Amino acid sequence: MVAVRFYAVEMSLPCLCPCPSSPISLSLCSPRFNLLNTTSRRLGLSRNCRTLRISCSSSSTVTDQTQQSSFNDAELKLIDALIGIQGRGKSASPKQLNDVESAVKVLEGLEGIQNPTDSDLIEGRWRLMFTTRPGTASPIQRTFTGVDVFTVFQDVYLKATNDPRVSNIVKFSDFIGELKVEAVASIKDGKRVLFRFDRAAFDLKFLPFKVPYPVPFRLLGDEAKGWLDTTYLSPSGNLRISRGNKGTTFVLQKETVPRQKLLATISQDKGVAEAIDEFLASNSNSAEDNYELLEGSWQMIWSSQMYTDSWIENAANGLMGRQIIEKDGRIKFEVNIIPAFRFSMKGKFIKSESSTYDLKMDDAAIIGGAFGYPVDITNNIELKILYTDEKMRISRGFDNIIFVHIREI
């Protein structure tokens, strides 16, 4: 007779201005998980790394301390609300959307730079972090911003030029190139910029010339026009909130905080181990480092792991999926296998020393629907918390593997 256990199971971008649809569609596909080779100075090992793409950004070269001081408390609250949101808002949960919108309203009610369109601080390149209504984008915009690997910028140059412009840039990668859609711009008042799209082109690294983007802007009339209000510009000039004529709200940044910089590196699949070392060094305070294993659902987005031939072994070692931490000392590893089926492994944890926990995992099963099929596997793991906050955790676990988890809301 086969023993069967029963479980109660809970089933569970836009361009920055309105741009007309195009008869051309562009599709760049990439797998959700990627293997890459990177060298971890912390571990002294060469490993294959597993990455879940997330939306984040970093373009600053200043130090982390300077970045941190560039934002006031209300701005940091908005930035904190953005941490872990995928697709620049496209995949945000209702709570995440509410947190971001609340933080946006607080900033819009504060006194930022008066008449931002007259300020030199609005000039330069801005990176799109979040949009509250990504569904209002045109089909070609959704093709670009719906894939996390793309980075979206906005260049604003209104003063000290005979050709004021607002340009939207979709950067595919450093090796492929970008698409730039340009608009003639004019200042209407202290907050509003009027624009009219008039040209666009692909700038591809492997071609010695630009490829025109075939959209007949002149024939589109009012569809190629719009306006953009800046409702908040930070005194440091590093954060901007804008609202477009389609009702969309945009959050843009010039500089980023340390967590955003690390998450951007993970998203780009380059130099992750080095970025983790840099982040940990900048956040280390040995006299106070005593991190707790915070409760909640934590999705793994990166690990310095070495894959084995057995996915179930990887799952049992916490090398994939999510960890669900409960405050009564219970923990669960959970991995989605195929639709309607997942691997679940339950256990308990106790704190053995500062920032270190002993995990005993001994209740594994393949779950399909409301039924659980036992798997005879046990595991003992020492988990060292290297850094944690309310949104992100860096830890060292099975076989000295480094993990980065994002807390799910």
Swiss-Prot record:
The reply on keyword Chloroplast is: yes
Q: Name one Pfam family in it.
A: PAP_fibrillin
Tell me the InterPro entries matching this sequence. Answer: PAP, PAP/fibrillin_dom
Q: Per the record's keyword annotation, is Transit peptide included, yes or no?
A: yes
Q: Where in the cell is it found?
A: Plastid, Chloroplast thylakoid
This protein's source sits in the domain of life called Eukaryota
Residue interval of the organelle targeting sequence: 1-55
Keyword field = Chloroplast, Plastid, Thylakoid, Transit peptide
Record's GO cellular component terms: chloroplast; chloroplast envelope; chloroplast thylakoid; chloroplast thylakoid membrane; nucleus
Similarity-based family: Belongs to the PAP/fibrillin family.
- The protein here is known as Probable plastid-lipid-associated protein 12, chloroplastic
Its taxonomic path starts at: Eukaryota, Viridiplantae, Streptophyta, Embryophyta, Tracheophyta
